[in-house]
Amino acid sequence: MMAEAKLIYPRYAVVRLRGIPTTPRDIARTLDLLRLRRKFTMVVVPGSPSIMGMIQEVNDWVTWGEIEADTLAEVLKKRGRIVGDKPLTLEYLKKWGWQSFEEVALAYVAGEIERLSCGRYYAREGQRPPCIPYLKPFFRLHPPRGGLNSVKLHFAAGGDLGYRGPLINDLIRRML
């Protein structure tokens, strides 16, 4: 019996830019499912067809693009939180078998691990978990230094909403 090949989807950073109280119910539900409950929160998701459909539905409330490993490592270092609102530290990562933030970020972007965060994890002897246990699945960011162009126009039209490709990394660095 042959082992099935796993599909490796690209990793996307999704940042919520609009926090309108009168958001339509279906959009609010999709933002909630993506765990984007407040303005300037970010999630990192795989580009599977179901997730991409959700992102397309909330395209007028978020900006998104491909995240690079060094940007993800920086986000984990500066904005990563574990349950109890404690900062994610290098000691905590080493406790679970990871040597650095960069190692986790590279493994996630390359598709070696499927998820960044998971709840309770029972480690087996000498085995590293396939995630960071108890990591919060979203990152709270600051408003961007230098401000935004427009949260009413799409990126291609000179605004900030929608798909922006690898340029999302510049925006995230301005928000750290």
UniProtKB/Swiss-Prot annotation:
InterPro entries tied to this protein: Ribo_uL30_ferredoxin-like_sf, Ribosomal_uL30, Ribosomal_uL30_arc, Ribosomal_uL30_euk_arc, Ribosomal_uL30_ferredoxin-like
Pfam families per record: Ribosomal_L30 (PF00327)
Keywords: Ribonucleoprotein, Ribosomal protein
GO molecular function: RNA binding; structural constituent of ribosome
Record GO biological process: maturation of LSU-rRNA from tricistronic rRNA transcript (SSU-rRNA, 5.8S rRNA, LSU-rRNA); translation
GO cellular component terms listed in the entry, alphabetical order: cytosolic large ribosomal subunit
HAMAP family registered for this protein in UniProt: Ribosomal_uL30_A
Family recorded in the similarity comment: Belongs to the universal ribosomal protein uL30 family.
Subunit structure and binding partners: Part of the 50S ribosomal subunit.
Protein name: Large ribosomal subunit protein uL30
Organism of derivation: Pyrobaculum arsenaticum (strain DSM 13514 / JCM 11321 / PZ6)
Species lineage: Archaea, Thermoproteota, Thermoprotei, Thermoproteales, Thermoproteaceae
Gene name tied to this protein: rpl30
